[in-house]
Amino acid sequence: MKIAEIAKEAGVSVGTVDRVLHKRGRVSAATKARIEKIIQENGYVPNAMARNLKIGSNLKFGILIPKLDSESGYWHKIYNGIKKAGDEIAAFNISLVIKEFDRDEENSLNEEGKQLIEENVDAIALAPVIQKEAFSFVKSLKDIPYAFFDSSITNASPISENIQIAYKAGWCGARVMQLFSPNNNNFICLQMHESAYNQQQRAQGFIDFFKQKNIPIKTYTWKREKNLSFNKFLDSLFEDNNNIDGIFITNDATGLISKYVLKKELLNTPYIIGFDLVEDNKEELLNGNISAIISQSPETQGYNTIMDMYKILFLKQEDNINKCPIPINIIIKENLP
């Protein structure tokens, strides 16, 4: 068995198995006995790359991610997955360097990315949420491999992508909206970041689903550069849309918008569908104010991205990475985890 297989069988991390194999670090007696029993029964085949790796050699992975405290905690969930993977591979002298950028500040992504390059990282994982800026950055990387999480950009060549297919997610959102409200057709779509490619694709998927049914969708985008506050944006929107049947939101602002809708005296209560199981959205889903949430499994995104880089760059197992997109999980009140 290989080290990853032993770890899976024992229900521990690969780092824990490594500590037992090489008799370093602390491992509980029970865990050690369980791992040793698995090795004794099945054998252990050392990975050629790990066996031949020079003692003291290191790998450094750079992470380029939006501000962790932004967008209701969604990015912090991705960070949790990244950190979990980083802890598991730390035993192999692999370290993480994390830089946060402000997606609402021009050139912030590039500036933070340049700092990663200056730190001589061996690879970079990033969320390319600003399409033009991210494309410019990855083109500047030259020989540094890179991986994407959260979203993708066209004409790029990442070594790994852990993303949800945004267009299909928008289409699914429309399908669920129709199930909730089959006899109505007054729906609107709200996009919170004009430059976010994945949000554009979600909106397009939602629009195209209803287009085939000859139902036009009103689309609104919060354009932050116009210095229009979020509440004023919503005030203006609902002045023109007082009798809507459903609202589709392309990011995790769903809970904020549902709370706003409750305070407004609309002619009817619209169905609300959005993204991400952040705490605010969970609360509103349980209260019945949000109809459904599309989960992107952010922790899984972060974890798989780092493990893919580990497999490709350390283990040299390019064919052993997960190439399936993140599932489009529809969460309602009754199946909330």
What are these regions (language model features)?
Residues S160-N185, N281, S297-F314:
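Hydrophobic alpha-helical segments within soluble ligand-binding/sensing domains
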Residues N47-N107:
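Amphipathic helical "hinge" segments at domain boundaries
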Residues M1-I55:
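N-terminal helix-turn-helix DNA-binding module of bacterial transcription factors
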Residues A123-K139, F206, K223-D280:
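Hydrophobic alpha-helical
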Residues I38, F210, S297-P337:
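Hinge/cleft segment of the Venus flytrap/periplasmic-binding protein
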